[in-house]
């Protein structure tokens, strides 16, 4: 075996947490249930803890700190810091730094901490079980987080905080309820194991199972079932191309409770500056991917010159739409700059600017609609192509 094939030694602490605790849960939780039983109080509190831990990871660690998708009030930050520590997935600083590295180097088997290219098991939890990385942390990509007092306080007190949230709080709850062991097993142990693997599904299954409507440049996939399990994180293909959007599920019907929580917090002053990617950019990504697939599919087939020509005409039209949108954005930015510089202070100029901005808005909406219609035409074109191929077979 050469040096490159030698695996690093096991990380004993992580082995105890990510292997030892699930084994303990598989044995102890059913045994206590058989001989003593659990009541509704314990199950409900286990679900409450699971929800608070999970949403603090998705809404706090992930969308707030890793991606800066919105701003949060100090109260909301402290809430996420405490309950996120209860998820036992490391401090905000370490978690967010790793996640930023994952996005920057996605699918790179050397630089991506949990690259899907190294397999389902590795991306799920294998990357944590061995000492694959140096013991010297690199937070060069998280200097903004190092200036956040909430992040740094949690990082410095993480061990005490996570111990209290995972053991101390369930014990106190058990004392109040009158069954310490049963409460610790459900609210502490089982809840923690479930919470771990729900999060790990995003690193693993969401890179192997699902669709890629927005980009095929990486392995991330959209999966509605995983979104249901992971508080809305399952729309992963969208997230990897538009990571600063506070939403993962962008349609009203897509299950994304994290998005709804952030939006609700913004209504009561706990969150602000929610980032939303424009509909035009979303449509552009979908069409760009669809055109790429259509070209590849038609290139493999012989004949169909008329359909291929239609496809190229549609693509040229798509390019024209993109150029128009780029020009409109440049014009919009220039007008905004002029307004901020005080160049349009007179009432007449303000009225003129309002009219021009309304006209720009109309043009943007027209372009968005044009892309939407082009998606339908492209779909019909591919249906024609598929029918033609079926007849030729």
Predicted feature descriptions by range:
Residues 1-200, 246-393:
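Non-catalytic, topology-defining segments of multipass membrane proteins
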Residues 235-243:
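Short amphipathic alpha-helical "interface-anchor" segments enriched in bulky aromatics
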Residues 205-210, 242-247:
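Interfacial helix-loop-helix junctions of multi-pass membrane proteins
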Residues 145-150, 209-235:
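Active-site-proximal inter-transmembrane loops
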Residues 90-94, 224, 241:
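Membrane-interface module
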Residues 56-58, 204, 223, 233:
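Generic hydrophobic/packing signal
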């Amino acid at each position: 075996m050469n040096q490159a094939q030698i695996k690093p030694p096991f990380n004993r602490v992580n082995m105890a947490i990510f292997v030892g605790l699930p084994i303990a849960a598989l044995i102890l939780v059913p045994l206590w249930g058989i001989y003593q039983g659990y009541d509704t109080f314990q199950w409900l509190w286990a679900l409450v803890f699971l929800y608070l831990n999970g949403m603090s990871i998705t809404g706090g660690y992930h969308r707030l700190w890793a991606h800066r998708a919105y701003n949060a009030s100090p109260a909301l930050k402290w809430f996420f810091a405490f309950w996120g520590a209860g998820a036992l997935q490391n401090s905000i600083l370490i978690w967010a730094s790793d996640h930023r590295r994952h996005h920057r180097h996605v699918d790179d088997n050397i630089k991506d901490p949990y690259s899907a290219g190294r397999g389902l098991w590795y991306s799920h939890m294998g990357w944590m079980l061995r000492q694959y990385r140096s013991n010297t942390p690199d937070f060069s990509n998280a200097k903004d987080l190092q200036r956040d007092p909430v992040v740094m306080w949690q990082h410095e007190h993480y061990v005490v905080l996570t111990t209290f949230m995972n053991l101390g709080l369930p014990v106190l709850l058990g004392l109040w309820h009158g069954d310490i062991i049963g409460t610790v097993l459900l609210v502490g142990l089982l809840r923690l194991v479930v919470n771990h693997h729900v999060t790990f599904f995003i690193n693993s299954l969401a890179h192997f199972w699902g669709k890629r409507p927005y980009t095929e440049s990486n392995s991330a996939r959209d999966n509605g079932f995983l979104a249901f399990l992971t508080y809305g994180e399952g729309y992963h293909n969208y997230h990897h191309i538009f990571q600063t959007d506070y939403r993962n599920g962008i349609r009203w019907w897509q299950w994304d409770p994290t998005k709804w929580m952030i939006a609700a917090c913004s209504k009561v002053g706990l969150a602000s500056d929610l980032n939303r990617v424009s509909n035009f950019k979303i449509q552009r990504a979908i069409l760009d991917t669809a055109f790429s697939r259509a070209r590849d599919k038609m290139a493999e087939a012989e004949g169909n010159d008329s359909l291929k020509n239609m496809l190229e005409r549609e693509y040229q039209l798509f390019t024209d739409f993109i150029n128009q949108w780029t020009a409109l954005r440049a014009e919009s930015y220039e007008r905004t700059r002029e307004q901020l510089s005080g160049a349009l202070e007179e009432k007449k100029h303000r009225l003129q600017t309002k009219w021009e901005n309304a006209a720009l808005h109309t043009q943007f909406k027209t372009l968005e609609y044009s892309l939407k219609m082009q998606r339908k035409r492209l779909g019909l074109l591919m249906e024609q192509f598929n029918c033609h191929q079926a007849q030729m077979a």
